[in-house]
């Protein structure tokens, strides 16, 4: 399973190829949480009894589409819409369950890596940042997938463990993916940012 395999590669590098005398940087990008969602065998059937509540904005009513562009309603019966998703008879609720099942392996991956950091006394000397590269829609506004400017499509999780920073703390200020590289350099003590970087370090918000 690709999520497990990528995690294995990461741990193999940490164990066998990392120079323990130098700082290290790892970028691990999981793929199985991209459509079509294919969970690991151990997670198949997970959440089968879980209730999936569809969003109120899915409703095909005049009130729901009041003030919205015509293309939003028109896309209901399209590749991006809940009435003909991916030009198929896809069950959007089951699709969401499949997504959650695939995501469970990412939870396992993060657990294995953080356990390695703890076992090697690096937990409090290593920053860990978990984020997505896009949102996803499961019926919101009558749509599926991504590729539009609704918040469900644009917003992504951003969770960070940074030694010395506040714990269990939520930042309300706007942050964007262009801020991640400057933040990593700041954590590493590199204050001079390359001129092509358009973002700002988020580290001051966590202190």
For each predicted feature, which ranges?
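Active-site-proximal cap/lid insertion segments
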Residues: 1-5, 11-22, 27-177, 187-196
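Catalytic core of tubulin tyrosine ligase-like
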Residues: 180
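Short, intrinsically disordered, charge-balanced linker/junction segments flanking boundaries
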Residues: 196-207
